Amino acid sequence: MTATWSVNKKIFLQNAITVKNNQPLMAVVKNNAYHYDLEFAVTQFIHAGIDTFSTTSLREAIQIRQLAPDATIFLMNAVYEFDLVREHQIHMTLPSLTYYYNHKNDLAGIHVHLEFENLLHRSGFKDLNEIKEVLKDHHHNQNAKMIISGLWTHFGYADEFDVSDYNVERSQWMEIVEALLSEGYQFDLIHAQNSASFYREGQILLPHHTHARVGIALYGSRPYSSLNQHDIVQSLTVKAHVIQVREVQAGDYCGYSFAFEVTKNNTKLAVVDIGYGDGILRTRAKHEALINGKRYPIRALMMSHMFVEVDGNVHAQDEVILYNNDIRIDEYTFKGVGANSEQLSAMNHDSLKKEYISNDC
């Protein structure tokens, strides 16, 4: 028996179609499409009617170009391999005045999207004046030069409801967009909304925008907890099996470093063939596993095993579900286990058996 990571292809595709909601999306496929596999995800998103993609890796951007020759591909990180960017017709962020002036000549022929820093402060121009400085310098540049195709930002607080920061960053961004458009500047692509913002706005684009730049929702995880589970459906299942069921007594310690102290006689512990070496986070192991439709508490986590406290209804070879649509990634995000993407990224695709299922199993 080998622990398995599996995706239902039909559910994945249908979720992408539902998330898209007939709106133009830029699908975020960074980090190997959130570890769902870049080729698989891009292919499914194309079937869902998505033809625009973004990533943080030039290597991935080139791979997307090979998969989708006619797609628009946006690189969210600035890079310095300008010839490769040109060769593969990759759009790229323009992250700062310094980068622009240092590489103005290198950027000739490359499509760039002007980036507004906003509240995240990770990258981008500080304010409207910096953006206009680039636009004016670019206008007067008589040499071979870059092609300004886009305008973008990232909302870092769209999933925060207890503070006003999303409203602040949204307002600041819209002021930038409207000021530039009112002065006659035009952009082929304007994008800012992540999954949380897209859903907060009712799955429609903000005014003047051409795309929403959606990531985690396309992979079946809700960006915030008040969304109904039926709105975003998880296609991923991570499962293992019971190797054996052990009976232990009050006062026994089970697992390394006294991980679990037994408090009742004749306690049953299922030994399960999955552990942190397969990508189960220790924070996730503070919660439950699903066996035969019932949740049971995980009591100890080891590299290749875990102990789950069970009852007489659990037997050797029973399936143990760590994640599926009934025990979801996003549920444990909201319980503090870690971000949706953190839990997905932890999965060890070298030790887990990887499957793509074509039916409704």
From Swiss-Prot:
Cofactors required: pyridoxal 5'-phosphate
Catalytic residues (UniProt): K30 (proton acceptor), Y256 (proton acceptor)
Modified residues (N6-(pyridoxal phosphate)lysine): K30
Disulfide bonds: none
Gene Ontology MF term list: alanine racemase activity; pyridoxal phosphate binding
Record GO biological process: D-alanine biosynthetic process; peptidoglycan biosynthetic process
InterPro entries associated with the record: Ala_racemase, Ala_racemase/Decarboxylase_C, Ala_racemase_C, Ala_racemase_N, PLP-binding_barrel
EC number: 5.1.1.1
Pathway(s) it belongs to: Amino-acid biosynthesis; D-alanine biosynthesis; D-alanine from L-alanine: step 1/1
Keyword Isomerase tagged: yes
Catalytic activity reported: L-alanine = D-alanine
One GO term describing the cellular component: cytosol
Domain of life, per lineage: Bacteria
UniProt keywords, alphabetically: Isomerase, Pyridoxal phosphate
Positions that bind substrate: R122, M303
Family in the record: Belongs to the alanine racemase family.
Function: Catalyzes the interconversion of L-alanine and D-alanine. May also act on other amino acids.
Protein name: Alanine racemase 2
